[in-house]
Amino acid sequence: MTLVFDVGKTNKKGIIFDAQYRVVWETSITIPETADEDGHACEDLAALCDWLRSTFHAVMSDARFQIDAVNCTAYGASFVHLDQDGRALTPLYNYLKPYPDALHRQFFDTWGSEQSLALQTASPVMDSLNSGLQLYRLKYEQPQVFEKIKWSLHLPQYVAWLLQTFLQKENKPLPVSEITSIGCHTLLWDFSRQDYHRWVYEEEIERKLPPVSHQRGRGLHDSSAALIPYLATVQEPFLLLSTGTWCISMNPFNTEPLTAAELEQDCLCYLTYEGKPVKSARYFGGHEHEKAVQQMAREHQAPADFYKKASLVPQSSAEADYLRFMTQLIEKQAISTQLAIGQSGVRTIFVDGGFSKNEVYMRLLSAAFPHMNVFAAEVAQATALGAALAVHVAGPIPPDLIAFKPY
């Protein structure tokens, strides 16, 4: 059995898979946010650690489960900064926290234009969403704190390290860095050199980053983890549209280099856990959808989940508004997805995550790509399953892990 912790921005899950990768147990929690020293909302790191610890020990002491492997996945663009005793020195800053204009200008005046750094690191410039800029900010805004940092860990690697400390109480394990986290829009990784960018060394940021480990089970960035079940079981080329807060079109079969124009439209490269680039395009669609349906529900005095009954033939004024909104959302989504398709010749789109269960979304998306095969993909806990498959040791991987519904 494999135990996986899937730490999402909203939901935190603990999941156990059996040898056939069926979910045999799961639990989830939503942890209320707290605030950092500036009053900005952020993850409650102490509450997260408490939940991880109690859930881990409950599973390990449960006679029903024989856990052979443990892994985790979490959202990216977030650092936990540890002192020499392994204590967190700062809040877990939110990647949506505004970035100071003066510091932004200072960085690019020193290290080169936004366009050149974006091309070298396959990262659109997004301020706090570029986790490397969070480290730069800490160095210049809180130099005393920066000096005390022994290790800065991306959240997936912090969770993995924490899980190891639960197992090894006597000797604390050494933390590591991991390629899926380093390679996801961080401005840290030079894709052509396959090494940290020059600025990371010259600012002495790399001294705060643990050695890169290619050992499995050291945590995965959630977007890279979600791709693994498809790469493991699907034979023909495909694009995966992974939907959640972000809707990310990921094309492992597009080998064209990123262009400046694509970067300006929020294209980027992720890295698989094997270190291969995955050309992708992001759209904040889930976030836009959440805000819009809340507003529509208020305006029409409709239930919060009114949109779940919506179809292409509206039955109410709220549903008519929803259809108009979704038509606009799909127009933006189609532009984003087409950027990831590029000249790759991919003819199949798989949609997973929340929107894969939304009939309006799926039918409008299929209409936007009439010459493509569009499928809603049903896979139990895709991101967590990817993390479990990443520590797969022996034996064949079942071919029926994913159910596909054509549109």
Placement of each model-derived feature along the sequence:
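Conserved beta-strand and immediately adjacent loop positions that scaffold enzyme active sites
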Residues: 1, 13, 78, 178, ...
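N-terminal glycine/serine-rich phosphate-binding loop of ATP-dependent small-molecule kinases
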Residues: 1-91, 347-348, 363-373, 401
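Active-site core segments that coordinate phosphate-bearing ligands/cofactors
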Residues: 4, 108-123, 133-149, 154-172, ...
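Short, basic and Ser/Thr-rich N-terminal targeting/leader segments
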Residues: 9-11, 68, 73-75, 129-131, ...
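Active-site phosphate-binding/coordination module
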Residues: 59-130
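Nucleotide/phosphate-binding loop and acidic/charged catalytic motifs
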Residues: 70, 97, 173-183
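Glycine-rich phosphate-binding loop of ATP-grasp-fold ATP-dependent ligases
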Residues: 90, 125, 180-189
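Non-globular, low-complexity intrinsically disordered regions
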Residues: 210-214
